[in-house]
Every structure is written in structure tokens, then in C-alpha cells.
Amino acid sequence: MKTASISFREVKGFGFRFDAPVHLSEGVSAKRLMQSCPYELLTIGDVSERVWHAGRWRRVYVNNPNNGITLLGSSAILKSDLSKEKIISVKYTEEKEDKALKKGWTLISCSGTIGNCAFANAQHAEKLASQHVIRVSPNNILREGVVYAFLVSKYGYSMLTQGTFGSVIQHIEPENVKSIPIPHFPDSFQKEVDDLMQEASSLREEAIDELNEAGKVLKNAAKLRALTPEDYDYYGLNNSGRKVSCFIRKRKDIDTTTINAFNHSERIRN
């Protein structure tokens, strides 16, 4: 059973609501704890140059990486391998500079599974992110690693994902992120946290590079060529960039379980 003591001021601030789920929710409890912090309280808006998402825009998808730029969705920001993400046309994408990501930013998923945070590294840099990713570009008040570490902590996550009255919200807006309180930690503590975050980010980049190099070594040793979209069976709608796969099967090879082409593909059978 969870219990807590609250003041009349808190009850008044919540419209005189006495129901326990409001006052005992993790988000409200985190904000209450922030009030007892020995350091000055700022907000994410105070310690950021900008907090925003790119909004919606028209996208033209392409297959050739030379003609496009990688677009990341809310789930992709957590992936280590971004080579298989969708590519959109450079020519037909306006205001690319405003949509491009920079190293050191905190990226937040604001739709779907909300509140997931990523510390942008070299893999994210200069790629684009959709309207489902909020960017936090820190200023010089707090170090960038500290801002990320706080937002990804249980306190930051609770305040990101819960509304004013403790309910779980379905979508995060930049204004929600800006209003989150964050302590103005001492410089020595900031340096310690930021150094650890920067080291972790560098190690992640090195690990990704090592994995990519290992993949190349394996392909060369096994004499495997790089796969293209044509190497995968495609049975979707007509697409100028993809050839529809086709093959012949004898009637006796098709049972009553399914006549879906994908299930009878030669690649699946092998």
C-alpha cells in the first residue's frame, strides 16, 4: 500500500481533489520531491535553446541513398543500426536544417511509446527525425549530458509521461517538456555526469563501428555481396522502385492452410 502526507496547499492546487491516485502517482510524487531539492529549480525550457518537433511535411521516399537522407521515427532513435531506416528525397524536403539532428541533443519519443529518450550521437547527426520526435537543444546553463541523464531517469520519465493529475498521457507536446522542473546541479556534479554520458556515447559509437566492420569482414570471408531490395520477395502494391516477385507452384504443393504467396516463396522454403 502506498501512502504519503500532503499539504492543504497541494490539495488546493489540484482543485481540492482528495483521491489517492492523483497525489500518489509517480509523476506528481516526482514533482513533490523536486520541491524539497536543495538546489535551485529551473525548467527544461530554462536550460534549453529550443524544445520542438519538426511538424508534418510532405515526404517523397527514395531507394537510392545518394539521392536521399535518412528519416528516423520515434522507435528508431533507440536503435544502434540506422542503416535500414527509410530514406526521403533531399530535393523535395524543405527546411532540412530545421529537421536535422545534432550530436548532444536529447531526443524524446512523443507518440506511440512516449517518453523514451536518446542521447544523440554521431549516428543520429545530420539525419532527419519525424514529428514524433521532440528535440531538446541545451544551452550553457546545464551540460547536455546532465539534461539527458535527468530526463531518462525515473524522475524525468515519470514527469514526461504523466499529466497534471497523474494520468498517463497519450502524446507529449514540446510545452509539456519545457515545463518539467530540473535542479541546477553544482558544476562539479554536472561535469562528473556529463563526462560519463559523453564516454558512454563515444563507446556506443565505437561499438557500432566495430559491428559494421565485423559485418564487412564476414561478407568478404563468405564472399557475400550486399543485398538490394530486389533480393527480397515483394508482393505489395505496384511500386516503380520494386519489382513484384513471381514464381510457379504445382497445385499439389498448395495446401488448404494458405495460398498467400509469401508463404510459398522459394526463399522461405529454403
Could you describe each region identified by the protein language model?
Residues M1-W57, P186-N270:
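Non-catalytic DNA-recognition/assembly elements of restriction-modification systems
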Residues L41-V60, S75-K103, N270:
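Sequence-specific dsDNA recognition surfaces
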Residues Y61-I69, L78, K84-I87, K99-L101, ...:
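Short, surface-exposed loop/turn microsegments at beta-strand edges and helix-strand junctions
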Residues I77, E94-E95, L107-C117, Y148-Q162:
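Well-ordered mid-protein domain cores that form the structural environment of catalytic cofactors
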Residues E95-K96, Q123, S167:
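A structural connector/turn signal
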Residues A100, C110, F150-V152, M159, ...:
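Intrinsically disordered, low-complexity, charge-biased terminal/linker regions in eukaryotic proteins
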Residues S109-A149:
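A short beta-sheet element
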Residues E126-I134, G166-S188:
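A short glycine-rich beta-alpha junction/loop motif
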